[in-house]
């Protein structure tokens, strides 16, 4: 399992200007009888930076079609990539754009306050993106980021959720450039996903369902990378793990898909 720590550098400081913006605060719930606020999950800049530098080059076009508080977008721009982003939360779009303009002024970026599933702005385009990297919402509406019914975070049914993910992946496949295994040219779609446990229904691993969708769309699973997860709610479910005889899930999965001819 790969481990990423928060590095105190300029990129981290830039990301914090967005993640700590009061306009974007959406606490998941409160604990300890309402005295301790538990915030929604926040990405590590070093995690984003590693994937961006490993799978793309300076000047490449990198896209995140569910960018939230913009960690992938900011890391890509910071490392000299052109960036395209989509988010349905207007505050997210404005705050990330402001951070780009203020702290990475020479960056080339197109941020859209629109649906990252359909990506209507590029419906006539194809083979234009060097790297897709996203961190889509968890299944079963685990965390709520806005009230837009088009957002995956508001889709409580699995069939509806994965139906929209399939549409998203179909559009990403059209927009991503073609890879060539023999020539060592890789233009990946990287999707970071997790799992949810639902009592008697057991463990629901998003990677399994998304791999099946990828296979259906003739996308090749090029790699599967596990990284350490440090969930905010971890300490609150330790007793349950012992009582119900399951283990704590402290990892997420990054699925790396590519498109071959």
Residue locations for each model-derived region?
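Class I S-adenosyl-L-methionine-dependent methyltransferase catalytic core
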Residues: 1-261
């Amino acid at each position: 399992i790969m481990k990423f720590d928060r590095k105190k550098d300029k990129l981290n400081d830039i990301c914090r200007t967005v993640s700590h913006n009061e306009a974007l605060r959406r606490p998941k719930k409160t604990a300890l009888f309402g005295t301790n606020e538990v915030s929604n999950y926040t990405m590590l800049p070093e995690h984003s930076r590693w994937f961006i530098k490993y799978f793309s080059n300076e000047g490449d076009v990198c896209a995140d079609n569910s960018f939230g508080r913009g960690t992938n977008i900011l890391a890509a721009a910071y490392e000299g990539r052109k960036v395209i982003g989509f988010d349905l939360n207007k505050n997210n779009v404005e705050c990330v754009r402001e951070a780009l303009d203020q702290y990475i002024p020479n960056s080339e970026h197109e941020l859209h306050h629109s649906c990252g599933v359909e990506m209507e702005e590029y419906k006539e385009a194809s083979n234009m993106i060097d790297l897709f990297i996203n961190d889509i919402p968890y299944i079963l509406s685990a965390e709520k980021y806005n009230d837009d019914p088009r957002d995956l975070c508001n889709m409580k049914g699995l069939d509806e959720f994965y139906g929209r993910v399939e549409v998203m992946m179909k559009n990403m496949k059209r927009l991503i450039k073609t890879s060539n295994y023999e020539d060592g040219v890789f233009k990946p779609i990287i999707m970071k996903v997790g799992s949810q446990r639902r009592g008697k229904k057991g463990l629901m691993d998003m990677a399994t369902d998304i791999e099946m969708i990828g296979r259906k769309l003739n996308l090749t699973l090029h790699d599967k990378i596990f990284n350490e997860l440090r969930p905010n709610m971890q300490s609150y479910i330790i007793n349950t793990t012992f009582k119900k005889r399951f283990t704590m899930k402290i990892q997420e999965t990054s699925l790396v898909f590519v498109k071959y001819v």
